[in-house]
């Protein structure tokens, strides 16, 4: 572990230990929290996480991620009750935490029928009908409908929290005024989520819950309550494991992952073999679907020069913008490329399109609409790199990793560059050297065999996993 990681996980364990007795309905609340958001506004602490001396201010020292994950594995086991009888004729519940599930409508319609599935949502909108049906044709149930008034209980818990904070005034996190406010807010919401989840599970026939993430308190709490009622849980992988912070700790019974990278990574932090299954992701099933628009039409719509090569450049707002400018400067004057800039999450033209005549906006076209008609994809260390390779496209990546970067793309070797000039030269080389194109193709295929083994559709693999985990259910 580097300094940042060691300090981060040590700080996390400080939190778990100090507040372990803060419980509601027998569940230790700190284990359910979204930890990082407890110090969102504590900028000094976030800077100090990279400092060697910061560890001297902490109570705990985490040297092994396995030991950290083990805490949550034991916590989950403590709240798992395999003796509870499930309701007969249970249905699969889909819970889209933080809008990260990303199941395309057509995939959901194909694999999740309304007689066997439903959607769990948090709150109702102002115009939500009493019994709403989603765009996929599935009934929706709202956790807020199963809530109760527990103000007195919340006040008692928050009073307990205040007493603990008073004892740890000198701690770099607990002693900061923004921590108490953030933690109290999560305490209240988690207590309500425990009530909502318990009441919903008691009243609805649920055979399995599929999550988009268990990183957030909303979904993590539901997953633990589900374990108490012997309901199996599956957590989909919503993006590449770029930063380990987004995937630790593991909470669901099974994490449905993209490929062998994640299997090996989860094993490295002590997760058992049966806790991880290679499923892929249902949205990727649409990547190689027949193009929805012709190249001629796209060329006209985007104002491309049909004689030039098309490069798709993936950016994220103004992140790394100085690097992208250097990249485009290298191509300025070459008069060989159309550079289509696709920003995320914005749909408006990126500022870079104003500075370079050969750079154009993607005009909101979906990634999978663009991929069939580009020659090369250039991106930062994002999931788009994997998606483009699944589409059979050469991918060249700019590497500016976070302190918790997992090394996901390391197997691509020189196709990943730290400097924009080197990245630009690599793309130039790809277009002029047949030998280099063959090398890139070989690297990409080997990478995909490890990162995304495409045996059968992900949607089908997920349905088979659900069937395996709910085997024997349906008996009263």
List each language-model region with its residue ranges.
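Active-site-proximal region of nucleotide-activated glycan assembly enzymes
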Residues: 195, 204, 212, 224-289
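Conserved catalytic-core segment of nucleotide-activated headgroup transferases in glycan assembly
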Residues: 284-351
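Short N-terminal targeting/anchoring amphipathic segment
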Residues: 90-95, 186, 198-216, 312, ...
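Glycosyltransferases and closely related glycan-assembly transferases
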Residues: 86, 109-111, 198-209, 219-232
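Conserved N-terminal ligand/cofactor-binding loop architecture of enzyme catalytic domains
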Residues: 1-195
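Donor nucleotide-activated moiety binding/catalytic core segment of transferases
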Residues: 345-391
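C-terminal amphipathic helix plus adjacent low-complexity
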Residues: 1-26, 31-45, 431-476
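Catalytic binding pocket for nucleotide-activated donors in carbohydrate/polymer assembly enzymes
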Residues: 250, 273, 278, 383-451
């Amino acid at each position: 572990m580097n300094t940042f990681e060691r300090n981060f996980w040590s700080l996390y364990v400080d939190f778990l230990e100090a507040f372990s007795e803060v419980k509601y309905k027998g569940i230790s609340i700190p284990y359910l929290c979204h930890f990082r958001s407890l110090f969102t506004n504590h900028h000094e602490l976030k800077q100090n996480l990279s400092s060697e001396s910061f560890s001297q201010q902490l109570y705990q020292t985490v040297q092994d991620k396995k030991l950290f994950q083990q805490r949550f594995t034991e916590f989950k086991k403590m709240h798992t009750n395999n003796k509870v009888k499930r309701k007969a004729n249970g249905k699969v519940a889909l819970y889209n935490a933080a809008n990260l599930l990303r199941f395309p409508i057509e995939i959901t319609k194909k694999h999740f029928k309304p007689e066997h599935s439903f959607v769990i949502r948090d709150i109702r909108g102002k115009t939500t009908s009493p019994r709403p049906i989603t765009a996929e044709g599935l009934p929706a149930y709202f956790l807020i409908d199963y809530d109760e008034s527990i103000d007195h209980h919340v006040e008692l818990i928050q009073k307990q929290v205040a007493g603990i904070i008073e004892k740890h005034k000198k701690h770099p996190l607990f002693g900061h005024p923004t921590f108490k406010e953030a933690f109290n807010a999560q305490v209240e919401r988690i207590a309500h989520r425990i009530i909502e989840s318990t009441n919903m599970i008691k009243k609805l026939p649920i055979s399995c819950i599929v999550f988009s993430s268990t990183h957030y308190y909303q979904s993590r709490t539901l997953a633990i309550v589900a374990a108490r009622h012997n309901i199996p849980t599956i957590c989909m992988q919503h993006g590449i494991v770029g930063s380990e912070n987004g995937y630790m700790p593991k909470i669901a019974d099974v994490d449905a992952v993209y490929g062998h990278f994640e299997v090996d990574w989860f094993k490295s932090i002590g997760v058992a073999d049966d806790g991880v299954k290679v499923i892929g992701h249902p949205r990727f099933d649409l990547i190689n679907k027949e193009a929805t628009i012709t190249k001629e039409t796209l060329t006209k719509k985007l104002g491309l020069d049909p004689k030039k090569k098309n490069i798709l450049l993936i950016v994220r707002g103004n992140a790394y913008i100085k690097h992208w400018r250097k990249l485009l400067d290298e191509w300025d004057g070459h008069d060989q490329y159309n550079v289509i800039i696709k920003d995320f999450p914005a749909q408006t033209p990126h500022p870079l399109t104003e500075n370079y005549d050969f750079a154009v906006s993607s005009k909101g076209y979906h990634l999978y609409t663009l991929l069939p008609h580009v020659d090369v994809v250039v991106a930062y260390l994002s999931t788009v790199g994997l998606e483009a390779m699944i589409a059979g496209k050469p991918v060249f990546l700019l590497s500016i990793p976070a302190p918790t970067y997992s090394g996901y793309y390391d197997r691509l070797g020189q196709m990943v560059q730290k400097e924009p000039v080197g990245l630009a030269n690599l793309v130039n080389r790809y277009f002029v050297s047949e030998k280099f194109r063959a090398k890139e193709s070989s690297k990409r295929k080997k990478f995909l065999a490890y990162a995304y083994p495409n045996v059968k559709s992900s949607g089908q693999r997920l349905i088979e996993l659900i069937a395996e985990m709910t085997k024997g259910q349906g008996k009263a």
